[in-house]
Amino acid sequence: MSNFFRDSSMGFKPRPNIFAKLRVRDVDSDSSANTVVENSSNCLDVGSSIEGDDTFKKPHKTSTEQELITSMSLSQRNHGYSDDMEIGSPKKTTSTDQYNRILKNDVAAIENDTDEDFEITEVREVSEGVAKETKESHGDPNDSETTLKDSKMHEYTMTNGKAPLHTSINNSSTSSNDVLLEAFTNTQRICSNLKQELQKQQQDNAKLKVRLQSYASNSDKINEKVGKYKSCLETLQERIATLTSHKNNQETKLKDLRQNHQLYQRRISGFKTSIENLNKTINDLGKNKKEADAELMKKGKEIEYLKRELDDCSGQLSEEKIKNSSLIQEMGKNREEMIKSIENFFSEDKAHHLLQFNKFEERVHDLFEKKLQKHFDVAKDTLNVGLRNTTVELSSNTETMLKQQYEDIKENLEQKMSSSKDEMAKTINELSVTQKGLIMGVQEELLTSSGNIQTALVSEMNNTRQELLDDASQTAKNYASLENLVKAYKAEIVQSNEYEERIKHLESERSTLSSQKNQIISSLGTKEAQYEDLVKKLEAKNIEISQISGKEQSLTEKNENLSNELKKVQDQLEKLNNLNITTKSNYENKISSQNEIVKALVSENDTLKQRIQQLVEIKENEQKDHTTKLEAFQKNNEQLQKLNVEVVQLKAHELELEEQNRHLKNCLEKKETGVEESLSDVKTLKQQVIVLKSEKQDITAEKLELQDNLESLEEVTKNLQQKVQSQKRELEQKIKELEEIKNHKRNEPSKKGTQNFTKPSDSPKKNATTSNLFPNNSAAIHSPMKKCPKVDHISKSRINSSKETSKFNDEFDLSSSSNDDLELTNPSPIQIKPVRGKIKKGSNCMKPPISSRKKLLLVEDEDQSLKISKKRRRK
C-alpha cells in the first residue's frame, strides 16, 4: 500500500489542501483526547490498585517484577499446579476481575459513544465477536492465541471498515483523498502493530529458549539427585543383604555352638560316669593289691622255709658224697693191701693160699656188698624219703597255693583289666588321640617289661639248669670213677662170676638211682623255674599295680583338669550366650532402624518417581506448549500465579527437606550408638551423612540462588519504577515542549507541514497503546506539520528510552484483553477499542497539493502529545 501511495507514475487529480480541514477539526479532537487521558489515568489507577494486592505483600513489586519472577523461576512445573493456583489465590482473581471490569466499562463507554454517533450495526457485531472471544478464552485457555488473532482481525476490520462508512455518510463534504489518507494511516498503524507483535514474539521465543535451558539444567540436576538416591538405595540394599547374611551366619554359628555345648555336656557326663567307675575299679584294685601283697608275703615265707629244707638236703647229699669218697679211698687202700698180701700169699703157698684167698675174697665181697648195700639202702631211703617229702610238700603246697593264687589273681586281673580296658578304651576314644597314644605307649612299656621279665626268667632258668647239670656231671664223674674202680676190680676179679653178677646188679641199681636222681633234679629244676616264674610274675604284677596307681593319679589329674576346663567352657558358653543375646538385640535394633530408613527411602523414591513422571509429563506438555506458545500471550500471565504457588511449594518442599534432614540426623544419632560394635556400619553411615550434607548444601545453594533472584528482581522493579517516573517526567516535559512547538508552529503551519510530511518514522513499541486509542481523525495530521527541529531530538530520545525500557520490559509487555483472569499485566494495545471523533458534515476539508505525493507516516507519541496540548490550550 505504501508503495502504491508513493508511486509518482500514477496521476491523481488536483485536490484541495486537507490540512485546512484538520485545523477545523481541532475542537473535536480535544474532546476525544480528554477521554483518552481519562482512560489512561483510570488504567494507571487500576495498575496501582493491582500492585497493592500482591501475593508476597511487598510494596515495590509490580507486574513487571512478577513477570521477571516467572522468567527466573522454574517454568516446567506450571501445568502440574494449575488447579492449586486457581484455588490458592483469591485475592489475585478479585484484583484481576476489578481490572477487567474497568477495562470492559471503558470499552463499553467508547463503543456506546461510537454507536450513538454513527449508529452502525457492524460495530455491534464486532463487540459481540469480542464477547465471544472472552467466553472462549474463559472456557479453553489453550485456544487463547487463536482468539487473540481473531480479535485483532476484528479490530483491523473495524478500523478499516469505519472509514468507508464515514465516507459514505459524509460524501458531500469529504473526498477520496481523506479516504486514502485514512487507509494509509490505518495500514501504517497495522504495520507498527505487526512490528510490535514480531518483537514480542521474538522476545517470547528468547524467553522460551531460556526457560528450556533452565528446564534442561533442572532436569539434569533432578536426574543426578535421582541417581544419587538410587545409589543410596542400592548401597542400603547391599548393606541389608550383608547384614541378613551376617545374621544368618551368626544364627548358624549359634546353632553349632549350642549343639557343641550339648555334645560337650554329654561327653562331660560320660566322663564323670567313667571317672567314677575308674575310681571304683581303682579302689577295688587297691584292695585286691593289699590282699595279694599279704598272700605274697605268706608265700614268700613258705618259699624261704622250703629253701632252708633244700639246703639241708643238699648238705646231707654232700656228706654222703664225702663218705663215698672216703670209702672209695679205703677200698683202694684195702685193695692194695690185699694185692700185696695175695702176692705174698701166692708166693708162699699158691694153692692153699688161692683157696683161702677165694674164701677171703668171698667174705670181703660179701662184707663189701653188705656194707655198700647198707650204705646205698640208707642213703637211698634217706634221699627218697627226704626228696619225696620235700617234693610232695613242695609240689602239693606250691602247686596248689600258686595255682590258686595265680588263678585268682589272673581272674581278678583279667576281669579288672578287661573292665578297665573297656572303660579306658571308651574314655580314651572319647577324650582324644593323645590319650590313645599314651595308652599305646603304656601297652608297649608293659610288653617290653613282660619281654624283659621273660628274658630274665629264661636266663635264670638256664643258670639253674647249668648248675644242676654241673652237679649231675660231678655225680656222673664220681660214678664213672666208681665204674672204673669196679672195672678194675672186675679185671682183678675176672675169675669170680658172682662178683660180676653182683657188679651188674649194682650197675643196674646205680642206673636206676641215677635216673631217679635225674628225675628228681629235673623236677626240682622245673619247680624252681615255676617258682621263679611266679616270683617274676608277682614282681611284674607289682610293677603293673604301681603303673596303674600312677595312671590312676594321672587320670585323677586329667579328671581335675577336665573339670576345670569344663568350668572354663561353661563360663565361656555363658559369656557367649550373653554376647549372643546382646548382639541379637543390637542387630534387631539395627535391622528395625534400617528397615525404617529403607521405608523412608522407598517412600522418597516413590515420591521422586512420581515427581519424575510429573516432570516427564511437564516436559512433554512444555514441548507441546512451545509450539503453541510462540503466538500466545495470556498463558504467560497465568504462569505468574502458578509460579508464585510453586515458590510457596518450593518453600514447603524446603521445609520437608529440612524435616527429612532432621529425621536423617536422628537416624544418624541412633546409628552412632552402635559405632563400637560395627566399624563398617560407621563408615557407611558417614558416607550417608556426607551425601546428606552435600544435598543440604545443594538445597541451601538453591535457596541462596532464589534469594539472589528475588533481590535482583526487587532491584529490577525499583529500576523500572524509577524509569517509569523518569518517563512520566519526560512525557510532561515533552508535553510542555509540544505546547511551545504548537504555539511556534501556528505561525508557520504550511512550510513545516510539507517538510515533515515527507519524513516517515517508525513507531516505537512502548507507545502502541496510545496509537490505538486515537482513531483516524483529521486532527491527527497536524502533528507532522507543526514539528520543529527539536521534535527530532525528542523523538530520538524517546526511541532511545523506549529501547532501554524494552531491555527490561521484554518479559512484561504482554497483551491483555478484557477476558484475562490474571493480574499485574499491562493492558494490551490491540484489545482496546479506538475512539473515533465526531465528523461533522459541514467541515471544510483541505486537499493536499499535487507535489505532496509521498506521504509521511505519523509518529504516535507526537500525535498524542499534540492533541493533549491542543486540548489544554483550548481549555
Swiss-Prot record:
Main location, first listed in the record: nucleus
Coiled coil: 177-333, 397-438, 456-752
GO BP annotations listed: double-strand break repair via homologous recombination; homologous chromosome pairing at meiosis; homologous recombination; mitotic actomyosin contractile ring contraction; negative regulation of reciprocal meiotic recombination; positive regulation of protein sumoylation; positive regulation of strand invasion; protein localization to site of double-strand break
Compartments where located: Nucleus; Chromosome
Residue numbers spanned by region Disordered: 47-67, 127-152, 738-831
Polar residues bias locations: 752-780
Keywords: Chromosome, Coiled coil, Meiosis, Nucleus, Phosphoprotein
An MF annotation (GO) of this entry: SUMO polymer binding
GO cellular component entries: chromosome, centromeric region; condensed nuclear chromosome; cytoplasm; mitotic actomyosin contractile ring; myosin filament; myosin II complex; synaptonemal complex; transverse filament
Positions carrying Phosphoserine: S481
Entry function: Required for meiotic chromosome synapsis and cell cycle progression. May act as a molecular zipper to bring homologous chromosomes in close apposition. ZIP1 may encode the transverse filaments of the synaptonemal complex.
Descriptive protein name: Synaptonemal complex protein ZIP1
Originating organism: Saccharomyces cerevisiae (strain ATCC 204508 / S288c) (Baker's yeast)
GN (gene name): ZIP1
